[in-house]
Amino acid sequence: MAEITNIRPSFDVSPVVAGLIGASVLVVCVSVTVFVWSCCHQQAEKKQKNPPYKFIHMLKGISIYPETLSNKKKIIKVRRDKDGPGREGGRRNLLVDAAEAGLLSRDKDPRGPSSGSCIDQLPIKMDYGEELRSPITSLTPGESKTTSPSSPEEDVMLGSLTFSVDYNFPKKALVVTIQEAHGLPVMDDQTQGSDPYIKMTILPDKRHRVKTRVLRKTLDPVFDETFTFYGIPYSQLQDLVLHFLVLSFDRFSRDDVIGEVMVPLAGVDPSTGKVQLTRDIIKRNIQKCISRGELQVSLSYQPVAQRMTVVVLKARHLPKMDITGLSGNPYVKVNVYYGRKRIAKKKTHVKKCTLNPIFNESFIYDIPTDLLPDISIEFLVIDFDRTTKNEVVGRLILGAHSVTASGAEHWREVCESPRKPVAKWHSLSEY
């Protein structure tokens, strides 16, 4: 019988030595774990602090300023009111939890077919701060923070903006410093203050878009933020216009527009050094001369199946959004709102290099018949860009909050003609 040879190495180590080695390894592991945890904890605390007082933004055709400073997603808890009478005697109302959201609930107008619903709080607006409300809804003095476009308060002082313009010849860069604003109006009746920030765009190309940080509860904000735009020849400065949009941050809805400042660089000569300017903030002119194009959509409702079919057919005459003048890459995003809450969102495929895209894409939504008066459908035509942020070309709203005659008529025909597809062209409005 052959002898079996054990080829495994043998280790003659004392149990005491092995125990000491194991204890040492354990101590090292615990120490490393504690060190890593402390570093992560300190880094998390630093992120929660306010941003530094002054930013230097180095841009080359794109905005690198962190959008998360003012565009964090806020979630408002929604609950059902079991005690409220609601519409038709037994329907429950959709309410915003005022205790957690910081909002005061308001009573619905018992008159009209839309009482008991919160569709008058739909977060879709004509502009940054102008909500679309149904005709039967009236505003009390404490409910609105913005002035209606038809308000007689046309001569209200909106404050002033101070900034400077400079040009770096070696780097061929335009340097704009937003310094401060004075005398801003109160946009929040509860705090008697405002949370201002500024968006700046270089017209007419709209390729350079930046914004400052939000300064809380102040009517005289000091931003002191510098933005550097590379790749702008000095010879082209005379054709450019600086557009400053002054806004107030709103955590519960779209930010409110305070006003705007338009500065043509044709009258500014930064060749000899920094030029400091102060301009009055004026009411924003929402009547834009540029056409946003048209969108054709088809809607049909099946009352038996309680199903809404939305078909995005095509668009035409879309504006060129690229500085190079090339055709865009449009797609359509469809948002469905029930009252204040968005209940569905979908989008079409991107159509490459065209200003007259044909989509022919359908989306189906299960919507009970009794909820139709509270439903609004928002269509956003968006220009896709691989290098910069996608830009909204225009918007269309159908439903109870449609502000255009064609939109209201389209929705009425859909509700009055069940099982029949109704297709119409609509002009897009500015987002």
Curated annotation (Swiss-Prot):
Belongs to the synaptotagmin family. Gene3D superfamilies: C2 domain (2.60.40.150). This is Synaptotagmin-11. It holds the Pfam family C2. It is a single-pass membrane protein. Synaptotagmin family member involved in vesicular and membrane trafficking which does not bind Ca(2+). Inhibits clathrin-mediated and bulk endocytosis, functions to ensure precision in vesicle retrieval. Plays an important role in dopamine transmission by regulating endocytosis and the vesicle-recycling process. Essential component of a neuronal vesicular trafficking pathway that differs from the synaptic vesicle trafficking pathway but is crucial for development and synaptic plasticity. Residues 1-15 are vesicular. Ubiquitinated, at least by PRKN, and targeted to the proteasome complex for degradation. Ubiquitination is inhibited by ATP13A2. One of its GO terms (cellular component) is lysosome. It is found in: Cytoplasmic vesicle membrane; Perikaryon; Golgi apparatus, trans-Golgi network membrane; Recycling endosome membrane. InterPro entries: C2_dom, C2_domain_sf, Synaptotagmin. Residues 134-154 are annotated as: Disordered. Its main location: membrane. Residues 140-151 have a biased composition (Low complexity). Residues 157-279, 291-426 form the C2 domain. Keywords: Calcium, Cell projection, Cytoplasmic vesicle, Endosome, Golgi apparatus, Lysosome, Membrane, Metal-binding, Phosphoprotein, Repeat, Synapse, Transmembrane, Transmembrane helix, Ubl conjugation. It comes from Homo sapiens (Human). PROSITE patterns: C2. The chain crosses the membrane at residues 16-36.
